[in-house]
Amino acid sequence: MAFANFRRILRLSTFEKRKSREYEHVRRDLDPNEVWEIVGELGDGAFGKVYKAKNKETGALAAAKVIETNSEEELEDYIVEIEILATCDHPYIVKLLGAYYYDGKLWIMIEFCPGGAVDAIMLELDRGLTEPQIQVVCRQMLEALTFLHGKKIIHRDLKAGNVLMTLEGDIRLADFGVSAKNLKTLQKRDSFIGTPYWMAPEVVMCETMKDTPYDYKADIWSLGITLIEMAQIEPPHHELNPMRVLLKIAKSDPPTLLSPSKWSAEFRDFLKTALDKNPETRPSAAQLLEHPFVSSVTSNKALRELVAEAKAEVMEEIEDGRDEGDEEDAVEAASPLENHTRDSSEVSQLSIDADKLLKESPFTPPPPSQPQDGANGPSEPPGHGALPATSPLDVAPGNENGQAVPVPLRKFRPVSMGARIQVSEEKQAADQGGDLSPAASRSQKASQSRPNSSALETLRSELTNGSLELPTPGAQSLSKRDSDCGSVSTSGSTDFGTSLSADMSVNKESGSLSIKDSRLHNKTLKRTRKFVVDGVEVSITTSKIISEDEKKDEEMRFLRRQELRELRLLQKEEHRNQTQLSSKHELQLEQMHKRFEQEINAKKKFFDIELENLERQQKQQVEKMEQDHAVRRREEAKRIRLEQERDYAKFQEQLKLMKKEVKNEVEKLPRQQRKESMKQKMEEHTQKKQLLDRDFLAKQKEDLELAMKRITADNRREICDKERECLTRKQELLRDREAALWEMEEHHLQERHQLVKQQLKDQYFLQRHELLRKHEKEREQMQRYNQRMIEQLKVRQQQEKARLPKIQRSEGKTRMAMYKKSLHINGGGSAAEQREKIKQFSQQEEKRQKAERLQQQQKHENQMRDMLAQCESNMSELQQLQNEKCHLLIEHETQKLKALDESHNQNLKEWRDKLRPRKKALEEDLNQKKREQEMFFKMNEESECANPTSPNKVTKFFPYSSADAA
């Protein structure tokens, strides 16, 4: 069910099959086999094999990384690395010679560095770097980091395994497989990526918390850890497993050198400055270049000497260290191995993906010595071999006079593995048993670049006198950390204790261990290196006591490398899933914002259309009203004119009657008066007629004007009412529009919050899923580790059990011979008595041997019980750490969800608070428009009253002609 949910989270509804993209620095149309010739295999990385290739035209060498890529998505995982390599042209950064994608395989051609990686050189020489060598490496790394950080690139996986060497004594910073290329200078990252031992504290915190991202200052911390690694072969806390080392980095103080007195004050101060847990106060690479530790570096001679020594001709021979008097052991003569020249470039040449290479390792493990029948117990367990010894140098003539040039004794910092002890002058140190203290053991670790002779003499005397104590098994590391651990979020190195060595006896009262004589089972490997530095031929001879533990150490490193590859694959898949999920979330947000914008635009468009329709309807209605008004005025004017014409005709008839009456009155007068009276009366009638006619026409004109004004006023009132009605409807529409937009905004806020909340849940679901997968892989690796420990213990116990009868027979013969000799010397008693005494002694020996066998059986049972308890404790501790991490992730998810809800509620409250003034401003604007409309209507009415010649006057409709006037 969880896996189905996980697939659902990563599935996009709009995903289609991706088309092939064209990348600037990747060629798709060319078969790399036509350009490059494979001349050898360098190794097998986590994602593909690495070959040594030669350009067919120029003859240039390259390291070719060939990766199977089945899809465009997988190809995109490596594009960042290719782009970074292609854009970084710097003398201390490895160069990209080409990239090809052909026939489902990605070929990345990288500059070939013959010197190999620094960690491989340290393994080859069995010592760390000297301070002058560290200074040069540090200086060149800082210059490379300054260049990278200036291009907004974070390396994120700095360590000795990713620092390659050239024959000229320069470094090449490599492995950009987990690097980040930012778009902005101040951009930060929150990916939990890199190798645990070199991780900065702020990067460690990103495993479960993404709230504290990191920037390029994380590389400065990794640089400081890398310098400690170069000084001590191993990084700090290498004895811890990755789960615990992450907690150690996050909670403990910054690491320091194990033996500060062996190093200069400038080096210690540089480490203190670089290893600042606060990234804000941690200096940049450019600032560190001004530090006295590196500012005085002017030459790379120290690195040229280092590369020459690592690539020197090596003569190896094995000297048998067993007792010559061992009757049951065959004497093996020391046989010199064939001369060979080591090519350290064939080891860890390419640090891409940080998986160091297996097939051409610069450190060829010597053949393990077979377990021999010894008198003092079985062979040593893994991790308890002997340390190399140093011998004086052979100096060849190298000056102009042909005289021998005195060369000082080269000091070594050998690797300490368990109970290996550093000695000098090719002498084996463990002559007699003794107790070794943890402090003494730590003092002999490979952290001292220049051990003095007095310390060696003191150690030799302690071994001889049996006063040196061994560490307890629970505190002893099983094997060296694999320096080729690669770029993974976790590592397979462990800190769980090993069982007791078979070459050590247990003091059950004190609980201490004592070394038994292991010379019967160990051999001495002597190496002689010859190389030339500045015309001086130097010969260095080193000796190291070896045993079968060497092979077991190699097996342990190989198994750890396999485990780290598994974790690296998990991390790569996790990064791909995170990228897909982030892309999905970005697409969802983008689609949601587009949909929001479309919805808002659609809503605005709807209301805009409604407003437009309303305004158009209003305009049409007003135009129709005006047309109706004009028609009405014409009809009303026509009707009134007709009525006035009829009235005027009647008025004329009345005037005619009045004229007749005047005539009738005149005719009634005497004849002599008629003419004069008629003339007078007719003049009076004519004047009266004119006056009445003028008054009548004026009255008609006034009535017409009043009628027209009344009609115009009615029309204006109707239009004003219609305008008010339309404005009201328009404002209601605006209110509805704003209310719909506000409701949509609130809905969008809610929807966006729900989407972001779901995306956050998906993000944490993916984190939990990946964390559980990682935990499952860690438990699987822990189970395999525990099973290996149990199997090794069983094999060791079987060897002890098989060896004990031989030892008892040898001891029995010796004791019997000594007893018989003592009886013969004493000469007491008869032959029968001597036979009886011998018989009794034989019976006592049988009882003693039986008791030894029972004691051994009990010891084995106790060892197995302790081992099972230790394995169970290991699993419990791992489970507890994993549970704490899961609980922390769930707790952080709860806090993030709570903070997200609180932020949403706050945003919603702020939005609602801002909504009130928006509503108020809208109402004020609408009221202002109403007032402006009323003011406009009022001003129009006043102008009508003040302007009698207004177009709306009656004269507009009825111009009077001369006929009308007549």
From Swiss-Prot:
Region Disordered, residue ranges: 318-411, 424-512, 666-688, 825-863, 941-966
Binding annotation for ATP: 42-50, 65
A single GO BP: protein autophosphorylation
Skewed-composition ranges (Low complexity): 437-451
A GO term, aspect molecular function: protein homodimerization activity
Modified residues (Phosphothreonine): 185
SUPFAM superfamilies reported for this sequence: Protein kinase-like (PK-like)
GO CC entries: plasma membrane
Stretches assigned to coiled coil: 571-945
Entry membrane topology: Peripheral membrane protein
PTM: Autophosphorylates following homodimerization, leading to activation of the protein.
Biased composition annotated in UniProt, kind: Polar residues: 452-467, 486-512
Phosphoserine: modified positions: 13, 20, 191, 437, 449, 453, 483, 512, 547
Annotated function: Serine/threonine-protein kinase involved in regulation of lymphocyte migration. Phosphorylates MSN, and possibly PLK1. Involved in regulation of lymphocyte migration by mediating phosphorylation of ERM proteins such as MSN. Acts as a negative regulator of MAP3K1/MEKK1. May also act as a cell cycle regulator by acting as a polo kinase kinase: mediates phosphorylation of PLK1 in vitro; however such data require additional evidences in vivo.
Subunit and partners: Homodimer; homodimerization is required for activation segment autophosphorylation.
Protein name: Serine/threonine-protein kinase 10
Organism the protein comes from: Bos taurus
Annotated gene: STK10
